[in-house]
Amino acid sequence: MRSAQVYRWQIPMDAGVVLRDRRLKTRDGLYVCLREGECEGWGEISPLPGFSQETWEEAQCVLLAWVNNWLAGDCELPQMPSVAFGVSCALAELADTLPQAANFRAAPLCNGDPDDLILKLADMPGEKVAKVKVGLYEAVRDGMVVNLLLEAIPDLHLRLDANRAWTPLKGQQFAKYVNPDYRGRIAFLEEPCKTREDSRAFARETGIAIAWDESLREPDFAFVAEEGVRAVVIKPTLTGSLEKVHEQVQAAHALGLTAVISSSIESSLGLTQLARIAAWLTPDTIPGLDTLDLMQAQQVRRWPGSTLPFVDVDALERLL
């Protein structure tokens, strides 16, 4: 016998979270819980404003329609990426095919003061990997901050993310302030320039390796080995089903590229599932999941070590 519940939720964000020039005051999304016999599975559907093609209202309509079809015996996955991902996670939990082992080691995210990151990294065991958003301020300032961090922590490797913010000139201004001796410790810089061609040129001219992120979701993207391209950053909420995520990881690994499972600012429930996906598909790579502290609460499932207030499922708005 099948049954299902759908919940709507909204979590207040910390002040200062800006996505594509718009302030994100709340994170809005949905959970689906599927039950069959004694088994149950959960999934999160939370389109990311400014990045997802769909709104959460559109996702809600597609999810509710899919759940009704599933209750009637239909199992075909929806096409909408955020819904496909959440539903496929719920089905995988239901079938016990999503491994429980999780990689909760997150590359800490530097959102402001580099001194805060230096302190955080001092206590980090093992490989020191951190992520810095660039492109929000002047490129020269970004270059100086990155150089400072690499100089202060000799065993640090940085992942940088520009979200296509730079023109070729700004990219050159950034690189000018990063000591060439340190550039090898930039693990990769995600999508530095507005076009792929300019990003490739940036990698050739600076010796700084790049990674594809937004490009993976463009219709003309193909997985090929390219000079200067070291990694792909896979955001499952923006990608689609677990099967599609798995295919992208396999395609990257076949070319010798690093595949990084990364957050789209999911709630703690979604983040714990991403940690499990990372341990399963990319066991040797630290995932990019250090986004929970951008929120003011965790929900339904706790993130290990988080001191954020916890909201149980009973406090959520039930739609079905």
Curated annotation (Swiss-Prot):
CDD domains: OSBS (cd03320)
Enzyme class: lyase
EC numbers on record: 4.2.1.113
Pathway the protein takes part in: Quinol/quinone metabolism; 1,4-dihydroxy-2-naphthoate biosynthesis; 1,4-dihydroxy-2-naphthoate from chorismate: step 4/7; Quinol/quinone metabolism; menaquinone biosynthesis
Pfam families in the cross-refs: MenC_N, MR_MLE_C
A GO molecular-function annotation: magnesium ion binding
Entry annotation: catalytic residues: 133, 235
Cofactor (UniProt): a divalent metal cation
Catalytic activity: (1R,6R)-6-hydroxy-2-succinyl-cyclohexa-2,4-diene-1-carboxylate = 2-succinylbenzoate + H2O
Record key words, sorted: Lyase, Magnesium, Menaquinone biosynthesis, Metal-binding
InterPro entries: Enolase-like_C_sf (IPR036849), Enolase-like_N (IPR029017), Enolase_C-like (IPR029065), Mandelate_racemase_C (IPR013342), OSB_synthase_MenC1 (IPR010196), OSBS_N (IPR041338)
Chain residues that bind Mg(2+): 161, 190, 213
Gene3D superfamilies in alphabetical order: Enolase-like C-terminal domain (3.20.20.120), Enolase-like, N-terminal domain (3.30.390.10)
Record family assignment: Belongs to the mandelate racemase/muconate lactonizing enzyme family. MenC type 1 subfamily.
Functional note: Converts 2-succinyl-6-hydroxy-2,4-cyclohexadiene-1-carboxylate (SHCHC) to 2-succinylbenzoate (OSB).
Name the record gives this protein: o-succinylbenzoate synthase
